[in-house]
């Protein structure tokens, strides 16, 4: 009986190669760092306290203008226990989707391949076989990444060539991989567009690059990630609507009762900073009923319904973003 139960469990974890659909998840992990000082990257807040005692470290923290970030740099104890709790909570969040996680996971705010591999090792028992992260030039050292039950091929980064007034600003590239599903090549783009501290035009130019990448080939494509587009800007400029000549946009196709993936405290608004795009007319489409914002009792504040960001002191919470999930059909 035990062997039969184990066999059935393993079958659930392995993607059905003859299926006509697969699931996908986007999750901004909110500062998934290891405990080591990654040379050349600004990871000084995410170190153990014992590594924060030097004059140089303390002085560099005092140069941070935002008080909350300055206090984090000085006093956050990002030790092994804290890191392991963060990883465990992320795994719990990921596998809460249908009991074993989505077939493909797109992640943002991952420091490096070292911490990604640690997360992958914890997810490997659930049938995941591959992970990808390519180091970008973001000064904070946070990158986009994938973990997948499918082999991923041809990983590459695409940088935005911004207008002259923005070209000196730091940005993150678009990460592209390909999978072969039912003998069909599918390209997947993972994005983390410039934050709302930057001009909206930088995000619009990032959307334009994504569109250029999409029309440069005829493969079925998915784009997902943290687009950093708040509802105020989207309403004023119709940014998501303007993508619909090329893409189906998840929260405009389904998830009608969803508030958003992120609560923007400054504007006091729910926003779909995170969403999923599926290419039009290229043989794939959303299962519209599957589109959802993944909320659980441990990733949500009970009183407000907002995302429960990870608290290093209590070791509770996951991220300040909710995951976005959907099932993709071949048609």
Name each model-derived stretch:
Residues 1-19:
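Classical Sec-dependent N-terminal signal peptides that target proteins to the secretory pathway
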Residues 104-106, 110-185:
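Structured beta-strand-rich core segments of catalytic domains in phosphoester-bond hydrolases
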Residues 29-33, 110-114, 136-140, 151-153, ...:
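Solvent-exposed loop/turn segments at secondary-structure junctions
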Residues 17-122, 136, 310, 331:
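N-terminal, active-site-proximal structural segment of metallo-dependent hydrolase catalytic domains
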Residues 73-83, 101-107, 133-134, 163-165, ...:
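Second-shell loop/turn segments in exported
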Residues 41-43, 105, 131-133, 163-164, ...:
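Extracytoplasmic, non-cytosolic globular domains
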Residues 23, 212-222, 229-331:
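Metal-dependent phosphoester-hydrolase catalytic domains
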Residues 24-29, 73-79, 83, 90, ...:
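Active-site beta-strand/loop signature of hydrolases that rely on acidic residues for catalysis
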């Amino acid at each position: 009986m035990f062997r039969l139960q184990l066999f059935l469990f393993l079958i659930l974890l392995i993607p059905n190669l003859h299926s006509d659909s697969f699931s996908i998840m986007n999750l901004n992990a909110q500062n998934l760092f290891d405990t080591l000082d990654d040379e050349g990257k600004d990871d000084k807040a995410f170190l153990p306290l014992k590594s924060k005692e030097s004059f140089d470290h303390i002085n560099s923290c005092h140069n941070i203008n935002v008080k909350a970030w300055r206090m984090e740099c000085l006093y956050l104890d990002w030790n092994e226990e804290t890191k392991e709790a963060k990883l465990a909570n992320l795994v719990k969040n990921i596998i809460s989707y249908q009991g074993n996680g989505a077939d493909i996971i797109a992640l943002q705010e991952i420091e490096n391949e070292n911490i990604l591999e640690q997360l992958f090792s914890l997810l490997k028992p659930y049938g995941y076989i591959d992970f990808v992260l390519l180091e970008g030039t973001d000064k904070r050292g946070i990158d986009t990444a994938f973990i997948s039950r499918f082999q991923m091929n041809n990983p590459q980064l695409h940088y935005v060539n911004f207008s002259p007034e923005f070209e000196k600003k730091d940005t993150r590239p678009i990460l592209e991989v390909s999978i072969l599903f039912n003998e069909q090549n599918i390209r997947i783009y993972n994005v983390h567009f410039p934050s709302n501290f930057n001009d909206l035009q930088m995000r619009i130019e990032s959307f334009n690059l994504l569109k250029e990448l999409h029309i440069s080939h005829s493969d079925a494509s998915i784009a997902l990630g943290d687009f950093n587009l708040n509802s105020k800007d989207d309403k004023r400029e119709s940014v998501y609507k303007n993508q619909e000549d090329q893409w189906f946009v998840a929260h405009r196709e389904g998830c009608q009762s969803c508030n958003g993936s992120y609560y923007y405290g400054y504007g006091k608004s729910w926003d779909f900073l995170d969403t999923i795009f599926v290419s039009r007319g290229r043989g794939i489409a959303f299962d519209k009923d599957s589109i959802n914002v993944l909320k659980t009792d441990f990733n949500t504040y009970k009183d407000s319904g907002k995302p429960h960001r990870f608290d290093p002191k209590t070791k509770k919470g996951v991220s300040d973003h909710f995951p976005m999930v959907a099932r993709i059909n071949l048609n």
